[in-house]
From Swiss-Prot:
SUPFAM superfamilies linked: Protein kinase-like (PK-like)
Associated pathway: Amino-acid biosynthesis; L-methionine biosynthesis via salvage pathway; S-methyl-5-thio-alpha-D-ribose 1-phosphate from S-methyl-5'-thioadenosine (hydrolase route): step 2/2
Sorted UniProt keywords: Amino-acid biosynthesis, ATP-binding, Kinase, Methionine biosynthesis, Nucleotide-binding, Transferase
One Pfam family recorded for the sequence: APH
GO MF terms, alphabetically ordered: ATP binding; S-methyl-5-thioribose kinase activity
Residues annotated to bind ATP: 44, 61, 115-117, 250-252
Protein name as it appears in the record: Methylthioribose kinase
Length: 394
């Protein structure tokens, strides 16, 4: 699909979104509906349509053909809406309790109609307020273990996988990730964004040849290792949760990539939240980091034993070893890019006072660099956490 809208594309409004829900038969025509645009992202409009009388709601998400923050001078493919709805449906085949149900999708209108999750909160916001989400890591570990196994070479016949990979060809959004995660933060690039007090530490990143070689190696893995269907943007802002329930959303960056990518991104975002905390308040994040890896290994291994193709059955140990090494490296890239790159996170940017924020951002750069440079030496998740704790003392 073109990067710009097709002739059938029409941008929804609150009134036309509500009318669409009725037209689809998701509400009765006599229902009294409210509709609010609630999206806080940069790439989509998100409408919450609600029938107060019957206490029933749904979400209508529409991709827009440009980045809101820039406007129409930065066109974006609306095919990402098809990618997102297809990924949610695929993920729902294996973990229906961990993703929103998709009720309807329209490729031309770039619309996905899905389950209302307004009873949950974005996990990043809750974590920043000190919530623990006791089931978060177990749920995400299960999500990773099942979704990453069942779309891989280890579970699928080669022809089936090739057809699936074609369906999830996602060049524009992969290019965004390549630039913002693996390239621009490691150069003195105009898109980078950081406090002037961090410049000497950013320059340390840019002048570290070993670190840049590591980032280039990880970029090559990201671009060339089409192991499985990955979410592509799995951070704490892409997860709704409460104390009991977890739902992974926003897989519009989905593509066939390395098993370790989603794992590394999620772990890095747990550690970014740990950097926003002090002392013993970090322990829940350490627990989540260990638990998500351990649960992933358990779930992935169980699926492997049950459903791995016979010709690949002997490869489990090597597959997990490579996934761990790459996840550590990808986590390092995520820590660095969220500190000095274009797209920041509130976990770091809302730390007060200012001097403390700068110190924590220095730590993020230091830890990220260590993970990239030493990913082959770190063999267990406890070693990853030990190196983090060694640097974060107060």
């Amino acid at each position: 699909m073109s990067a710009t809208k097709t002739s059938l594309y029409e941008q929804l409004t609150e009134s036309s979104a509500a009318a669409l829900a009725v037209k689809l038969g998701l509400f009765q025509s006599k229902s009294t509906l409210t509709c609010r645009e609630i999206g806080d992202g940069n790439l989509n409009y998100v409408f919450h349509v609600y029938d107060k009388e019957n206490k029933k709601g749904l979400i209508i998400k529409q991709a827009i053909p440009y980045a809101k923050v820039v406007g129409e001078s930065w066109p974006l493919t609306i095919d990402r809406a098809r990618i997102e709805s297809s990924a949610l449906i695929r993920q729902g085949e294996h973990v229906p309790h961990l993703v929103p149900a998709v009720y309807y999708s329209d490729t031309e209108m770039a619309v996905t109609v899905m389950e209302d999750l307004s009873h949950l909160r974005i996990s990043r916001k809750g974590l920043l307020e000190g919530q623990h989400y006791p089931n978060l890591s177990a749920h995400i570990g299960e999500f990773l273990g099942k979704t990453l196994f069942y779309s891989s070479d280890y579970a699928l016949d080669a022809k089936v996988k090739q057809q699936l990979a074609k369906q999830f060809t996602n060049p524009e959004l992969c290019n965004i990730t390549e630039r913002l995660v693996f390239t621009e933060p490691f150069l003195d690039h105009e898109t980078n964004d950081f406090e002037e007090e961090l410049r000497p530490y950013a320059e340390k990143v840019w002048n570290n040849s070993r670190l840049k070689e590591g980032a280039d190696e990880l970029k090559a893995i990201f671009l060339n290792s089409a192991e499985t269907l990955v979410h592509g943007d799995l951070h704490t802002g892409s997860i709704f949760a409460d104390e009991h329930e977890t739902k992974v959303i926003d897989p519009e960056f989905a593509f066939f990539g390395p098993i370790g990518f989603d794992i590394g991104q999620f772990i890095a975002n747990l550690l970014l939240n740990a950097l926003s905390r002090d002392g013993d308040d970090r322990q829940p994040l350490y627990d989540h980091t260990a638990a998500v890896w351990d649960t992933f290994v358990k779930t992935f291994s169980e699926a492997w034993e049950k459903d791995c193709l016979p010709s690949r059955r002997h490869l489990l140990e090597d597959t997990l070893k490579n996934a761990f090494e790459e996840a550590v490296g990808f986590a390092g890239c995520e820590l660095i890019r969220r500190t000095i790159g274009l797209a920041h996170v509130a976990d770091l940017d809302e730390i007060t006072p200012f001097d403390k924020r700068i110190e924590r951002k220095k730590l993020a750069l230091d830890i990220g660099a260590y993970y990239i440079e030493n990913r082959k030496e770190l063999k267990h998740i406890t070693e990853v956490l030990d190196q983090f704790k060694l640097r974060v003392k107060e």
